[in-house]
Structures are given as C-alpha cells and as structure tokens.
Amino acid sequence: MLQPKKTKFRRQQKGRAKGNAQRGNQLAFGSFGIKALETKWITGRQIEAARIAVTRYMQRQGQIWIRIFPDKPITRKPADVRMGKGKGSPEGFVAPVTPGRIIIEAEGVSYEIAKEALRLAAQKLPITTKFVVRRDYDIQNQNA
C-alpha cells in the first residue's frame, strides 16, 4: 500500500480542494493517460488496484507512471465513542485529486491496448475520468 515513509505531523486538517488542478494537469511522461473530472480523495489501496489492473492488461509491456501519491493522513475514531476527547488516530493516507489532474500515464503500447488498460484502471477509482492522448501522437502511424 502506498504511504509516505515519514511525515512531519501525524495528523492533518481536512481542508477543501477547490477549483481545477493547477499543476499535474498535462501529460509529462507517456503518450496516454487518464485525467480526473471531479474532486475526490483517492486512497493508496485504490491507486494500487488501478496499477495492478493496468499492468495485468498490458502484460508487463510498455511503461506506466502513477502521477499521484497519497500523502495526506486520514484519522478515524473507533465505533461507539462519544464526540470530543480529541482527534482520532491516523488510519491511512489519501491523495486529494481535483478536476484536470493526470492520474496514470502509459507509454510503449498501441492506442487500443492503452485505452482498454486505462479504462480498466479507471473502474478501480472512485471518480469519473477521461482518456487523454498526447497532442502530437499520430494514431494512424503508430510506432509502438
């Protein structure tokens, strides 16, 4: 499961993710990717499930990049505990995602394989996504 090796503080305030992604909103490494269309927290387990789905479908060909990392700690209080008495203990980590953020990128496979692999990955995530292709990529003249 993805999580930071070390954090400065054990707990963090919830905060609100407003607006669109200001960085990480364009393809940087691969020719294909999936882009988030809504705001949500994505857990490390969900990212790992998406990564496994892509890797299995691509049969370990090509290369993938995970562009988000769960570095925000989430706390939970135990069941049957009354309000108050402090913040709960850390339970896991999430990656806050805003619209426009590239989540996964792929390279080194054909257009059809990449589209299906990233569709399978998108099904593992709790948000709606969109398949994106690099602007200068020529679908008719694939060299992959």
Curated annotation (Swiss-Prot):
Annotated GO CC locations: cytosolic large ribosomal subunit
Keyword tRNA-binding among UniProt keywords: yes
Source organism, top-level taxon: Bacteria
Stored Pfam families: Ribosomal_L16
Gene3D superfamilies given in the database record: Ribosomal protein L10e/L16 (3.90.1170.10)
Keywords, ordered alphabetically: Ribonucleoprotein, Ribosomal protein, RNA-binding, rRNA-binding, tRNA-binding
SUPFAM superfamilies, per the entry: Ribosomal protein L16p/L10e (SSF54686)
Compositionally biased region (Basic residues): 1-17
Region feature Disordered, mapped onto this chain: 1-22
One term of GO molecular function: rRNA binding
GO biological process terms, semicolon-separated: translation
Record's function text: Binds 23S rRNA and is also seen to make contacts with the A and possibly P site tRNAs.
Family membership: Belongs to the universal ribosomal protein uL16 family.
Binding partners and assembly: Part of the 50S ribosomal subunit.
Name of this protein: Large ribosomal subunit protein uL16
Gene: rplP
